[in-house]
């Protein structure tokens, strides 16, 4: 939205800057909640030794050939993940990685994030890439008993723990250009970053809170909170590198 000239600056007050890590905000928009894009695995088919030191980069290793499910290249979650790889590893390296990922896919990409988790539960693949809140949503029973049962058959794994950390993305708020009540809009963002609002958000979306001192939903807590988040890669780079990400995925034959 900022790139299209739809947002204005102004989210620079001290309360916002102190609440939100700098990689999750700019003067035009700010993260309100976080989600991690992680790996889900079948514990009966994937060993601890295979997972040791697993990174997004190593998902292209030939040992995972025919074992991986992930969404299509037109999905924004995947575009952001691949954009982060372009930022950290370069376009050429990420192009090679994309080809490895396509080679390792158990099937052509189809369905949403929950469909990837369901595929692992059904034995169609051994590992899936999906956002954290989807597993919690399935475990909650809100998507029905079949998805709840399937979710219990997989385990979460947080990649890149020995390096930059697990890929994080945000739900955010921005200031629309020309908004007549800029001062009140900033106050709304401040409220969304309050303990009261953060508790409401995380217990309804299954995301991670943006501010310290607020606990996620118990189903998210059960997935583990002691993991290293990627605080190095600024979210703004996901947009800047999006076209490169889509280019390398398309060239690799990532449907």
Where are these regions (language model features)?
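Short loop->beta-strand "edge-of-pocket" segments that line small-molecule binding or catalytic clefts
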Residues: 57-76, 84-86
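Extracellular/periplasmic bilobal clamshell ligand-binding domains
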Residues: 216-255
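Short helix-loop capping/hinge motifs at secondary-structure junctions, enriched
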Residues: 44-53, 86-95, 179-185
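Mature extracytoplasmic/periplasmic domains
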Residues: 171-232
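Periplasmic solute-binding protein
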Residues: 1-6, 24-51, 83, 168-173
């Amino acid at each position: 939205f900022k790139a299209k000239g739809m947002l204005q600056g102004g989210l620079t007050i001290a309360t916002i800057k102190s609440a939100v890590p700098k990689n999750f905000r700019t003067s035009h928009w700010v993260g309100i909640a976080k989600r991690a894009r992680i790996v889900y695995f079948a514990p009966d088919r994937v060993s601890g030794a295979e997972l040791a030191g697993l990174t997004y980069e190593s998902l292209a290793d030939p040992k995972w050939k025919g074992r991986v499910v992930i969404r299509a290249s037109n999905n924004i979650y995947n575009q952001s993940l691949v954009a982060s790889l372009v930022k950290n590893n370069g376009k050429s390296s990420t192009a090679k990685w994309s080809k490895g990922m396509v080679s390792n896919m158990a099937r052509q990409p189809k369905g949403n994030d929950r469909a990837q988790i369901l595929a692992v539960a059904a034995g169609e693949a051994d590992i899936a890439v999906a956002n954290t809140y989807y597993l919690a949503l399935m475990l909650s029973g809100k998507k029905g008993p079949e998805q709840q049962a399937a979710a219990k058959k997989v385990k979460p794994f947080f990649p890149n723990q020995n390096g930059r950390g697990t890929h994080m993305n945000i739900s955010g708020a921005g200031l629309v250009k020309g908004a007549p009540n800029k001062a009140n809009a900033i106050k709304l963002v401040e409220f969304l970053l309050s303990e009261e609002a953060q508790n409401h958000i995380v217990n309804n979306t299954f995301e991670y809170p943006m501010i310290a001192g607020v606990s996620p939903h118990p189903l998210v807590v059960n997935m583990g909170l002691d993991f290293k988040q990627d605080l190095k890669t600024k979210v703004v780079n996901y947009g800047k590198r999006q076209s490169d990400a889509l280019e390398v995925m398309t060239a690799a034959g990532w449907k």
